[in-house]
């Protein structure tokens, strides 16, 4: 494992992820409080009808374990947005191991590029109020996975919202009424043409006091170019990394003039 190359504190090594779960049933006892408002549950269930998953030819059921819970994720290799990537595993591990330090219980969290939803599910299990966002074609599968793993067993039901990077931000996420303690992102940086819009979206969603946690497997030169631009607008700390898997986890605090 590497030592910290540029961060303000010594990063911790990232494990390869949790061991595969056994065959015990999904926990439903969850946190100390369950959603008591039936209207909230009904609203979340109704929202499921708004999102129709892409008609992939095949899905698989993948199993993960975090926070002592068995998490079942429906995935498909036919879409980047329907697969759990290594950065998501690293970010889940960090949230699990630093729950008290991060003060996640009751925290308002937005995840950028939530994909099949593993990070948002773990954050919800840890007691956060989560808004999971992604492109329209993956929202149905995302909502399915969130409800399957959080309904009746987390303090707050996560919300699903469409977010196209750089588009309609003020209309969909008005700063006057919405504030997030944390913005989470994992493996959103790879070889695509929307990196500038991604960075603009990260900047927009962060207000004074917001902490951005970004985990990514670094594969391409464009990943490092994005990191350079990220550091220009965020005070950046390397929290953890794995030399073997090329995964890095950063904390970003938006710079204010």
Swiss-Prot record:
Q: Which reaction does it catalyse?
A: L-lysyl-[protein] + S-adenosyl-L-methionine = N(6)-methyl-L-lysyl-[protein] + S-adenosyl-L-homocysteine + H(+); N(6)-methyl-L-lysyl-[protein] + S-adenosyl-L-methionine = N(6),N(6)-dimethyl-L-lysyl-[protein] + S-adenosyl-L-homocysteine + H(+); N(6),N(6)-dimethyl-L-lysyl-[protein] + S-adenosyl-L-methionine = N(6),N(6),N(6)-trimethyl-L-lysyl-[protein] + S-adenosyl-L-homocysteine + H(+)
Which EC number applies? Answer: 2.1.1.-
Q: Which residues bind S-adenosyl-L-methionine?
A: 85, 113-115, 134, 165
Q: Does the keyword Methyltransferase apply?
A: yes
Q: Which InterPro entries match?
A: Methyltransf_16 (IPR019410), SAM-dependent_MTases_sf (IPR029063)
Which Gene Ontology cellular component annotation is one that this UniProt entry carries? protein-containing complex
Q: Where in the cell is it found?
A: Nucleus; Cytoplasm
The record's Gene Ontology biological-process terms are: protein methylation
According to the UniProt entry, its GO molecular function terms are: heat shock protein binding; protein methyltransferase activity; protein-lysine N-methyltransferase activity
Gene3D superfamilies recorded: Vaccinia Virus protein VP39
| Region of interest: Disordered | 1-40
* Family annotation (Pfam families): Methyltransf_16
Q: Does the keyword Transferase belong to this entry?
A: yes
Q: Where is the composition biased (Basic and acidic residues)?
A: 24-37
Subunit structure comment from the entry: Interacts with members of the heat shock protein 70 families; these proteins may possibly be methylation substrates for the enzyme.
Q: What does this protein do?
A: Protein-lysine N-methyltransferase using S-adenosyl-L-methionine as methyl donor. Mono-di and trimethylates 'Lys-943' of AARS1.
Family of this protein: Belongs to the methyltransferase superfamily. METTL21 family.
Q: What is this protein called?
A: Protein-lysine methyltransferase METTL21C
């Amino acid at each position: 494992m590497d030592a910290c190359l540029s961060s303000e504190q010594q990063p911790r090594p990232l494990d390869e992820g949790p061991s595969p779960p056994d065959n015990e049933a999904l926990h439903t006892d969850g946190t100390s409080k369950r959603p008591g408002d039936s209207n909230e549950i009904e609203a979340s269930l109704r929202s499921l009808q708004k999102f129709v998953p892409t008609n992939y030819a095949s899905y698989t059921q993948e199993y993960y374990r975090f926070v002592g819970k068995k998490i079942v994720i429906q995935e498909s290799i036919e879409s980047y947005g329907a697969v759990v990537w290594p950065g998501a595993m690293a970010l889940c591990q960090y949230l699990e191991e630093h729950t008290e330090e991060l003060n996640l219980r009751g925290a308002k969290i937005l995840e950028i590029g939530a994909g099949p939803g593993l990070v948002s599910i773990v954050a919800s299990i840890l007691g956060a109020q989560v808004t999971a966002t992604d492109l329209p074609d993956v929202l149905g599968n995302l909502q399915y996975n969130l409800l399957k793993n959080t309904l009746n067993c987390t303090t707050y039901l996560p919300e699903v919202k469409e977010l196209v990077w750089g588009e309609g931000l003020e209309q969909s996420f008005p700063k006057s009424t919405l504030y997030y303690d944390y913005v989470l992102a994992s493996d959103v940086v790879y070889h695509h043409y929307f990196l500038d819009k991604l960075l603009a979206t990260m900047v927009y969603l962060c207000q004074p006091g917001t902490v951005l946690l970004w985990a990514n497997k670094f594969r391409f030169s464009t990943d490092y170019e994005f990191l350079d631009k990220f550091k220009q607008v965020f005070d950046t700390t390397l929290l953890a990394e794995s030399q073997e898997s090329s995964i890095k986890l950063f904390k970003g605090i938006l710079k204010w003039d």
